[in-house]
Amino acid sequence: MSRKISRALLAATALAASVIMVPSASAAHYNLEGWGTQCGGTTGGAGGGTVTVSDAASFINAAKSTTTQTIRVSGTITLSSMTKIASNKTVIGVGSGSTIAGHGLNVASASNVIIRNLNFRDWSDDAINVQYSTRVWIDHNSLRNGNDGAIDIKRASDCVTVSWNKISSHDKSMLLGHDDGNGGEDRGKLRVSYHHNWFDGTNQRHPRVRFGNPVHVYNNYYGGVTSYGVASTMEAGVLVECNYFENTDDPFHRGEGSSPAGSLVARNNHMVGSGSGDQGGSVKAIPYGYVLDSCSGVKSVVTGGAGVGKVG
């Protein structure tokens, strides 16, 4: 399969890239890419100790500790409220069955946090909420049938990568920026990369963006999205690049609800039974290098690699 390493010299309508040949999605390709590599990078609990937890009390104690640590989740942990994850933590599921249920994880006023290889089911608020936080990587999780947002990022958070997650049977998938009136905190922040995520019959917010610029949405698979794919609103600048949209009438647009249009540049997206989308304006340059899969092959790569059971 052909892939391009893009060195991101994007201006409004220009992108420079070099081309290399790589076989197929592999563990090497599952390494951190995108905005999570910026601002000093994201290493989570690397270099610290490791603890395995299998009940809520042990998980909460480990999550709030001030030590650099990897927390391995075994089995199902049912939370009675949103649980805060402190800085310098990796939270990773063991195998493919590790599950967070009842409530979700709150990355608040933290930095250097990784969340990987977890199932999230039947959450009452958000499955993963990120606010006032930087250097966060959310990777290879499976999220299904929750109440509010699956992965919401807001309130001046910055330098975040959201990759290889599968979201299914859910309404509000990914919010970036929570309010049109929060520009005082959010301008110059909310820079997030979304890549290789699988949106399986979901409804909206894939993502819905305010203020972040540049936000990079690439190599995701949208299958049967019912309301809309990507929305750029309220001063945002979003590059929608080389995604695979299938049976998605409204793949991307500018403006949403009462929020005014942001900028959106769409490039080389692969459309199957989908609309053409709406784009306009300019987006700031992408500052990092990244692996870009063949656009027509994204469905195969993502459905084979997204969700739990691939890492951890």
What is the predicted function of each stretch?
Residues V209-N213, Y218-Y222, T226-G312:
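Extracellular beta-rich repeat passengers
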Residues G104, D126-A127, A150, S173-L175, ...:
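Structural detector of coil-to-beta-strand junctions
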Residues Q38, T43, T78-T83, S232:
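Short aromatic-glycine motifs in intrinsically disordered, low-complexity regions
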